[in-house]
Structure formats: structure tokens, C-alpha cells
């Protein structure tokens, strides 16, 4: 708890607006985010919450913190096969090394690791201390910054008119500190990840329609069939202002032969993580298993988007 307060002092809106760390008492790590649209307008945003729901207890994970050469090689090759430029790949790994060197490899898994649990556990206090002691005042990179760094070349934004970006101030501080995005890229980032005003409803079909309409109005489109932005849309409702949908977490999904690799940054001060999945259903279940944590049903269920549409595999877990 002490470290969470310290992180909040660095950036107050980590929980509400940025890829943020949400840890239970065991140290499980999580995050938050925003996304965009594809080449074709999507009218059918059916978010059927299937009754054939998987128990969260049955999810298992295989992951790496990109500290090992084998996984790094797999990711580099997969990104190159998806059409990402060598320069962008190199910059991504420079960012990974910046974080990993700061926190120390001993605090990260050393290879692609299988665990009999849905989510990894970290010594969160130790990671945060190490990052804060070695980051030279830089807040770090989060899920949105990481996803756009990888996907930006494959996203078009025809109408660069961002909505509410108030809660993205930590993102902006990080971007400004290292000039991560400038000019058109910064305008695209702001437009894609701005919050979307929606009706006050728990109907995920209606919310998905509103998200898609907002993206269509902004003329946001994706153009890569080998690499996709996966986003977890969440609801923000403070009871005073307009209800909004925002991307509480995002990552990039890339093909790797008969597997899928999901590349994510858990939070500004928490690790990069690459997860290996056999199919897209497992991707949805991993994300819903972590981010659908409103047991009292105070807000709508999270909605998982693949690029500009609800994932076909979207379902709510038990």
C-alpha cells in the first residue's frame, strides 16, 4: 500500500487514466488503456456475454519479461514478419532494456515461464523501488505508449479531434519527457486514446456501438492483418460528470507461427510482459479474468476490442 501511494504521488490518475498497477495482497499485477478503428466501418458490435463462461480458476499463463534472448528473438522475428520497421523494433527493445536494466534481471522471470495461475505475481514493492531509484525522474512507459509505439505506423486517423484527454496527463508527461511522439504521431495518439462520453448503461452492446461510432467519426482505421491492437474498454463513472468509456489496458497481438504473442507493458513502473496463447479465446479470457473485477456490478462489464471491433471471442468469465 505504501508504494501505491508513492506511485500516486508521481501521477495521481494512474488508476483512472493510465496503464496502472492494481495489486491484490498476493502481488498480482494489472493495468489500464484506449484503442481505435479499422479500414471498414463496423456496424455489428454484438457483445454477447456468453453463458458458456470459463471459471477464472481454470486460466493458466505462459509469459516472459523479455529478459531472455530466446523470447526476444521470437518477438523480434514476429514483429518483423508483421511488417514493423527495424527502427521501431530496435526502439521497442531499447525501452524494454531501459526498464529491465533499472529494476534488475533478478526481479524478472528469466525465460518463457508457465505458471499454474491466471496471472503472474511480482515483488511489487521491490520493482517499484528499483524503478524509482534508477529512472532518473522519468515516469516510464505504460500500455498505451507501448502499443502505439508498435502499432502507430499501421493506424490512420483522418479526423484528428481528440475528446477528453484530462486523465492522460501521466502519458503526456512521459511522452514530453523523452519526445516519444511528436507532431502527427502525438495528434494521433491523443485522438485514439481520448475518453468517450457514453450513455449511462450496463448494456455492453450499446456501449460498443458508441465506441465504434466515436472512432468512425474520428476516421480511425487499422491496416495490418498480422498484428492487432487489443484493448480493454472500461467505464468511468464518478457520479458527477458524463459516463465515459476508456481503454484501461491495451497490448499488441502478433502471430508467431501457430501461436499468438501478446505484448504488453503492465504499468509505468511495472514490467514488460509477453504472453503466449494458443488461440484468441485464451487472449480474451486472460484479459477478462483480470480486468472484470467489479463483483458488485456497479459499472458495465469490460469490453475487449480487436482493432476497431469487439473480439469475436469476447465472453464474460464466471
Regions found by a protein language model. Name each.
Residues 7-13:
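Sec-dependent N-terminal signal peptides
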Residues 1-4:
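Positively charged n-region of N-terminal signal peptides that target proteins for export
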Amino acid at each position: 500500500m505504501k508504494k501505491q501511494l508513492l506511485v500516486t504521488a508521481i501521477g495521481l490518475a494512474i488508476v483512472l487514466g493510465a496503464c496502472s498497477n492494481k495489486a491484490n495482497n498476493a502481488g498480482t499485477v494489472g493495468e489500464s488503456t484506449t484503442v481505435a478503428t479499422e479500414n471498414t466501418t463496423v456496424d455489428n458490435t454484438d457483445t454477447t456475454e456468453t453463458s458458456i463462461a470459463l471459471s477464472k480458476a481454470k486460466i493458466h499463463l505462459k509469459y516472459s519479461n523479455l529478459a531472455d534472448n530466446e523470447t526476444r528473438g521470437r518477438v523480434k522475428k514476429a514483429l518483423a514478419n508483421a511488417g514493423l520497421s527495424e527502427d521501431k523494433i530496435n526502439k521497442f527493445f531499447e525501452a524494454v532494456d531501459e526498464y529491465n536494466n533499472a529494476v534488475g534481471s533478478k526481479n524478472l522471470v528469466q525465460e518463457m515461464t508457465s505458471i499454474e495461475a491466471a496471472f503472474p505475481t511480482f515483488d511489487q514493492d521491490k520493482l517499484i523501488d528499483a524503478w524509482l531509484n534508477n529512472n532518473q525522474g522519468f515516469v516510464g512507459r505504460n500500455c498505451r505508449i507501448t502499443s502505439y509505439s508498435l502499432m502507430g505506423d499501421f493506424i490512420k486517423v483522418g479526423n484528428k479531434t481528440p475528446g477528453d484527454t484530462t486523465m492522460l496527463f501521466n502519458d503526456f508527461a512521459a511522452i514530453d519527457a523523452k519526445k516519444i511522439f511528436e507532431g502527427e504521431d502525438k495528434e494521433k495518439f491523443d485522438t485514439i486514446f481520448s475518453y468517450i462520453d457514453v450513455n449511462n448503461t450496463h448494456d455492453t452492446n450499446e456501449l460498443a456501438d458508441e465506441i465504434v461510432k466515436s472512432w468512425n467519426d474520428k476516421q480511425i482505421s487499422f491496416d495490418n492483418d498480422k498484428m492487432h491492437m487489443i484493448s480493454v474498454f472500461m467505464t468511468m463513472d464518478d457520479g458527477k460528470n458524463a459516463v465515459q468509456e476508456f481503454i484501461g489496458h491495451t497490448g499488441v497481438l502478433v502471430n508467431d507461427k501457430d501461436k499468438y504473442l501478446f505484448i504488453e507493458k503492465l504499468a509505468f513502473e511495472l514490467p514488460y510482459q509477453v504472453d503466449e496463447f494458443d488461440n484468441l479465446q485464451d487472449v480474451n479470457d486472460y484479459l477478462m479474468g483480470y480486468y472484470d473485477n467489479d463483483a458488485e456490478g456497479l459499472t458495465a462489464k469490460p469490453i475487449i476490442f480487436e482493432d476497431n471491433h469487439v473480439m469475436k471471442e469476447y465472453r464474460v468469465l464466471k
